[in-house]
Amino acid sequence: MTSEIRNPELWREGELKIEWVRRHMPLLAGLEKEFKESKPFKGKKIALSVHLEAKTAHLCEILAEGGAEMYITGSNPLSTQDDIAAALVHEGLNVFAVHGATEEEYFRGIRKVIEVGPNIIIDDGGDLVNMIHTEYRELIPNVIGGCEETTTGILRLEAMNKAKELEFPMMLVNNADCKHLFENRYGTGQSVWDGINRTTNLIVAGKNVVVAGYGWCGKGVSMRAKGLGADVIVTEIDPIRAMEAVMDGFKVMSMSEAAAVGDIFVTVTGCNDVITADHFMKMKDGAICCNAGHFDVEVAVAALKKMAVGHAPARNNIEAYKLENGNTIYIIAEGRLVNLAAGDGHPAEIMDMSFAIQALSAKYLVDNEKTICREKGQMLNAVPREIDNEVANRKLADWGISIDKLTPEQSKYLYGGH
């Protein structure tokens, strides 16, 4: 099968990026050595829909070293980096993704990696799993199981599982402690502001930053905005999270209220229509909107285009929309993921943990192929605590940190037994 990428000649630039993250992902380096010897994925086809940048490319390399036949596509039209795709193809992996893909090109890539009949699926947002269930049902028996990286993808899986429409086991990677406690909070917090700052080149200190959603990602974005000197306002639909935001020192109000006072808006919800036409009309002249959730539906860009009396590029990756009231609203990266469409994503050291969870979860599926539950309605699987702890212990060891252990007497005191 011939790969479909933008320009194979870009592989040298991509290789430099991948080499940089290799040096900063020691957990994956250890797994690469182990997988190279044990070949846990020998004879298996792995299909991935991922944000195709240097760190995910390194994960693909690790799985390939483990014996897998790799088929890779993007999970977002703007997050694929063409030089990274070229580097992977140069290494002999199969890639079907281009930066700036049209909707047709994007779903063509999804179809390409499904049509090979994968045994393991690694998904980011749920498009791969959804399509195999709706358009390629004859290939479902080939699938041992899959891994889902995101909150949005897990919500889609939960809906499918509840309706008994999910027909193979899925590992809920996003729910692992070593994933959401670190990547979602610290990774998103840093990478979102990296994307915003490098794109706008504006100061954050003294501005009103509105963060929509106070899950782990929203907490990270809010924390880093506060650290940059912003006055942070949180909007929420969950009363518990709203109280948590208040007690963390942030203002909480409805989006309708926040729209009138915000300078920078960041959506981190995974839901659609978080910022709508009504909100745009209330915003200040020069308000900046961006999305750090998943799909490009959180900020209603399509509605903004319809209501604008004109729009034009304001700067690379920023579009200016002129409203009939005379105000201008700025949208970063077309409302797609600001940390990937306008940046390089989460820091390598953070993704080292998340991708170690991914790799070990994929291995878990293969190791437990004959015993894992395949009953409809019971297809969702937590990452085993042993895997979570293994990743945490490896990371601490890499940092040169040792921690205490319970004595037998302490263990008996806490948990009983003899």
Regions found by a protein language model. Name each.
Residues V50-A68, E183, G187-V261, T267-T269:
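Glycine-rich phosphate/diphosphate-binding loop of Rossmann-like nucleotide-binding domains
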Residues G74, I121-D124, R137-T152, C271, ...:
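ADP-ribose/adenylate-binding Rossmann-like module
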Residues I5-N7, L16, A29, K36-E37, ...:
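Ligand-binding pocket scaffold of soluble enzyme catalytic domains
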Residues M1-F41, I72-T80, A85-K207, Y415:
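Glycine/serine-rich phosphate-binding loop and adjoining beta1-alpha1 elements at the start
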Residues L10-M25, F41-K45, E53, F168-G206, ...:
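Adenosine-phosphate binding glycine-rich loop
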